[in-house]
Curated annotation (Swiss-Prot):
It comes from the Eukaryota. InterPro entries: 7tm6_olfct_rcpt (IPR004117). The chain crosses the membrane at residues 34-54, 63-83, 130-150, 176-196, 256-276, 285-305, 358-378. It is a multi-pass membrane protein. PANTHER family: ODORANT RECEPTOR, ODORANT RECEPTOR 47A-RELATED. This is Odorant receptor 47a. Expressed with Orco in 40 olfactory receptor neurons in a broad area across the antenna, including both anterior and posterior faces. This expression pattern matches the distribution of the small sensilla basiconica. Expression in the antenna is observed late in antennal development at 93 hours APF. It comes from Drosophila melanogaster (Fruit fly).
Amino acid sequence: MDSFLQVQKSTIALLGFDLFSENREMWKRPYRAMNVFSIAAIFPFILAAVLHNWKNVLLLADAMVALLITILGLFKFSMILYLRRDFKRLIDKFRLLMSNEAEQGEEYAEILNAANKQDQRMCTLFRTCFLLAWALNSVLPLVRMGLSYWLAGHAEPELPFPCLFPWNIHIIRNYVLSFIWSAFASTGVVLPAVSLDTIFCSFTSNLCAFFKIAQYKVVRFKGGSLKESQATLNKVFALYQTSLDMCNDLNQCYQPIICAQFFISSLQLCMLGYLFSITFAQTEGVYYASFIATIIIQAYIYCYCGENLKTESASFEWAIYDSPWHESLGAGGASTSICRSLLISMMRAHRGFRITGYFFEANMEAFSSIVRTAMSYITMLRSFS
């Protein structure tokens, strides 16, 4: 389990946080969050660009995408600050339960190791996609300016974010400083998003591993006597209940984040889809396509992890059904007690656990709904242009 949260630890450290801090004050180096303060400072100029271009649908959509990205990045950073002690408490619970289960058998340690290795591969890929999108966002304005100058002998200054500054960016010094500020500030959007989203991914992956261990145990439980069978089952049920409690803690932390993520992702997809449909044959099309991909991946991670958690938690019902419970039962009240506990556990497991964003459940159906809603918004925007 050495790989637990390793990608997340290195990413969130760039914002000054230490996930494995011995005390609950995880934000040890606030000065590292200068990029977040920079995006907060540039926010009014992005808003000014939105208001300035409100009559031009194309420019308005471009500015609105930047505005929504900024809002989501600032919101996620504020949630990291607000929830950092809750995250520390959850991390301690995960590490303790992982240690306890790994000590009970090599097969349980293997389940946990496999889950963490797969999780870290997915989180590394997710982080790479976001960093590539950030690099493309920073480089593409220079590429467009170079092409424009080569073809027409003149280039208008462009920035990573559409901003309306009170100074003249046609002056080289002003432009260079504005460009560096915008490019640096954009990392204040990327790092909180990658950190928060991959932490969720890692938590859900390990919760699924705990549910798999509970299934493994209940399918293979055997007792020499009714008392021993009941004691073994009680330990399995305790693991399942502990996992459900941790699911509930995770859901309480992430409900507002998932709600904001899905709402803003729907708006971003509709505007980026509209911009891509207009500019797909131009250099801007590559930029918008990369952003569409990152936003879809971002929404997909929450839906995929939520779907997996629901499936694994509900599979405990079938594990009980497939278990050799009848081999450990005899006649009498103790036998009836075991049957009753098995039935109650099956009834509870039938519901599974659902990750929610207040008004909706994070699953693949919700992901399809987000994409369909975005497509309908694109049609509406095209009718206005």
